[in-house]
Amino acid sequence: MSDYKETLNLPETGFPMRGNLANREPVMLKHWYDEDLYGEIRKAKKGKKSFILHDGPPYANGDIHIGHALNKILKDIIIKSKTLSGFDAPYIPGWDCHGLPIELMVEKKKGKPGQKISAAEFREECRKYAAVQVEGQKESFKRLGIMGEWDKPYRTMDFGTEANIIRSLGKIADQGHLLKGFKPVHWCTDCGSALAEAEVEYQDKFSPSIDVRFVAADEAATLAKFSTPEGHQGEGELSVVIWTTTPWTLPANRAVALHADLEYVLVQVEAHGEQKAERLILASELAKSVMDRAGIEHFHNLGFAKGSELELLQFNHPFYGFTVPAILGEHVTVDSGTGIVHTAPGHGQEDFVVGKKYDLEIANPVGSNGVYLPDTELFAGQHVFKANDSVIDVLKEKGALLHHHAIEHSYPHCWRHKTPIIFRATPQWFISMDQAGLRAKALEEVKSVEWMPEWGQSRIEGMIEGRPEWCISRQRTWGVPIALFVHKETSELHPDSLELIEKVAKLVEEKGIQAWWDLDIAELMGEDDATKYEKVLDTLDVWFDSGVTHFSVVDSREEYNFPQEERTHSADLYLEGSDQHRGWFQSSLISSVAMKGKAPYRQVLTHGFVVDGNGRKMSKSVGNVVAPKDVTNKLGADILRLWVASTDYTNEVAVSDEILKRSADAYRRIRNTARFFLANLNGFNPETDIVPAEEMVALDRWAVGRAFAAQEEIIKSYDEYNLHEVTQRLMHFCSIEMGSFYLDVIKDRQYTAKKSGHAQRSCQTALYYIVEALVRWMAPIMSFTADEIWNEMPGKRDKFVFTGEWYEGLFDLAEGEDLNNEFWSKIQAVRASVNKLLEAARGEKVIGGSLQAEITLYADDALAAKINKLDNELRFVLLTSSATVKPLSEKSDSAKATELDGLFVDVAASEAAKCERCWHHVADVGTIEGHEEVCGRCVSNVEGEGEERKFA
């Protein structure tokens, strides 16, 4: 027997069954960088059609988390698939490097600027800190197998990028979109700075809910509006009632707002017990609910009036000695409250807008630290949130408080400090959404973009329609300066602003943003102007920094310098989490439309947030955090990459140890399929051993055809960014089409056919074609494993799979072929039915293995005609030692029905001897002299010309 073992074509490969990825991947990674793989890809793709995926910059602070890994892996898969599709797709990773979180970290170590450390030194410390953070994150991203311009990423703090951010501001100002205004903005009292929309998050908070009386200044004039008849005008004090959850804003109250079209009622509160008689004005729809919460049971209506009739009536401020007007506003509703809104133009966006219309004072008695200014009557020196109780006490004392209780509601918080914020009117710089038609143009451009998923379009449209002006100024130290000069008396911009901005940008390009603070104005504009103008000392919102990277990076980097006729937009694709509709997607769109009149991207693709296996947010306190480093150290990056590609990432993306274990199981199945291919290509040289397609065994041609069909679907799914469809198709191909059928059937031929004979070489030709395609399908997702396979494959090839393109050597079966796809589908159905009966026979101890079986198939005429096309090779497809086809009319009593109509099968144990080489039970075993242990087929395969196979 041992002599015959040497004659078998046994599989052999250096590609191990176990991936051992955690140890093997770092070695491969070093090889990639030693050989400059990214540079090799760029050389190979030079001159090809371009594809630009522009990286949204993560913030340079802390370790990367699983959301970062999801985002960067998705981008890398898409870039690699585009490269294989023949695109030149450079990838320049970026980092957001200015802003408050870095300032806070440096403050902890060095103190606040202007105290223990100068502002210039503080900026330098921030720059150093950010650089260290970038390097840490960079190594983590590289470990995930992400290819890119890691030696020259973009950082918003690079001098050239800072200069281009300043130039962007100049372009926006030049297009007429810049606005200086004293407006209420989101203000964090802990940051001591304005916040952008994207820096605000909403959390539940308990607040005092109060109903407050504003007594009518002219009772007769007010009563007249309600047309109450003589003698029925009621009794007691006459007031409008406002409702608010921010008592601290009442010192800044300058009006009460009603809706022009709402009906208001004059309610007589009757004297009853301790309740005094009084008259209250409320929205008719809300009067009952106000009375209920105030505990007033005895009341009746005196008269009604439209909101429009009450305009400009005067009411006394509840604790200051001045009157405020009744005004009309569209923002007033009857969803809650009293239908009358307390209006403080310095503390609310809607209040500000309506206040401008009525020329109200925009009072702001609150300092940047959230404390009332020294001249604030009654409340000077108190922090606004602590002052709520003081305000309520004063209202009680003045008899102005109708009712108060605590409510829990959604309230804006600072995204960094997680503390409640306020609206506060301050002089700020804005990008105006309407003064030069920016909102309308942005909405028009939204329609030209392909949003994936589609709901992204309506989401961003709603946000742009409703958003206020973009407040781009910050009162911070570590940021790109708003490099403008304003007139000391009029606050007007210098008439040569664009020219001056370019001069400043050139200085910043050379020395960084510190050049602005070191700048002597006279050197830039001459002594005369220098006496009249001063520098703006605010810095830019970090969302402006990242928002203008379509210009500061994409339009400016040499790597993206493609022929203009190819480019319809700065970038082809932006890909970030779905929270970026209110963040980076929006800041990029607004700035690009403001600068260039068009969207910066052709497509926008969003992914959901990562949650645990139970759908809960990742949280250290819950203990459900999955760190990318832990996964790569334990399972390897390819498992993490396969997890990313296996999920429908447009929804929430779940991860847990169990989910990653499932990815590891799927990985093993794919790896083992690839290993089978490689092991059975042992001894195959594609330059000399390829069998022409028309001469290949029919089943081998079918297998290549299945790979051809799979490749078409896989490339289409890659092109449409449906990565989970890629992995599903890949798994189906490996497990079902190959593993459950083709690879199972060909083992006999591959192992036992004549070494280097036609039957074996046909099979190896198919395996070679398929693995050439398979390794490329895998490469964008399981990059390390694909590279490992590539290095074990036979034949001459490029150094790396990543520099090539999809394999073009596959071919499909023609539908006109006799043994076409439909034929092989039917044969697989027959095989599945036979296998069930073989399993049953094995369970009943009729046979041991399937090769011990002799089967007879009783088939109807149509099915018999199909099966008979395989002639005497049917047994190889069914993995039995003998298979005979007979008409259904001759069916024996022992034949059993199958799941297929028109097919019965009789399973019997073979009485023939077993061939010690191929294990088939065949009548001619022992009949050939000198080869008593083997069958005639094996003798031919060992010493003769080898068996002939046509079909299987």
Curated annotation (Swiss-Prot):
GO annotation (BP), single: isoleucyl-tRNA aminoacylation
Record's keyword terms, sorted: Aminoacyl-tRNA synthetase, ATP-binding, Cytoplasm, Ligase, Metal-binding, Nucleotide-binding, Protein biosynthesis, Zinc
Chain positions of motif 'HIGH' region: 58-68
Cofactor(s) the protein requires to work: Zn(2+)
Binding site for Zn(2+): 915, 918, 935, 938
InterPro entries: aa-tRNA-synth_I_CS, aa-tRNA-synth_Ia, Anticodon_Ile_BEm, Ile-tRNA-ligase, Ile-tRNA-ligase_type1, Ile-tRNA_ligase, M/V/L/I-tRNA-synth_anticd-bd, Rossmann-like_a/b/a_fold
Keyword Protein biosynthesis in record: yes
Known EC number: 6.1.1.5
Main location: cytoplasm
Binding site for L-isoleucyl-5'-AMP: 576
Binding site for ATP: 620
GO molecular function: aminoacyl-tRNA deacylase activity; ATP binding; isoleucine-tRNA ligase activity; tRNA binding; zinc ion binding
Main EC class the enzyme belongs to: ligase
Domain of life of the organism encoding this protein: Bacteria
Record-linked Pfam families: Anticodon_1, tRNA-synt_1, zf-FPG_IleRS
Assembly, per entry: Monomer.
Entry note about domains: IleRS has two distinct active sites: one for aminoacylation and one for editing. The misactivated valine is translocated from the active site to the editing site, which sterically excludes the correctly activated isoleucine. The single editing site contains two valyl binding pockets, one specific for each substrate (Val-AMP or Val-tRNA(Ile)).
Purpose: Catalyzes the attachment of isoleucine to tRNA(Ile). As IleRS can inadvertently accommodate and process structurally similar amino acids such as valine, to avoid such errors it has two additional distinct tRNA(Ile)-dependent editing activities. One activity is designated as 'pretransfer' editing and involves the hydrolysis of activated Val-AMP. The other activity is designated 'posttransfer' editing and involves deacylation of mischarged Val-tRNA(Ile).
Record family assignment: Belongs to the class-I aminoacyl-tRNA synthetase family. IleS type 1 subfamily.
Protein name: Isoleucine--tRNA ligase
Organism per entry: Aliivibrio salmonicida (strain LFI1238) (Vibrio salmonicida (strain LFI1238))
Upper taxonomic lineage: Bacteria, Pseudomonadati, Pseudomonadota, Gammaproteobacteria, Vibrionales
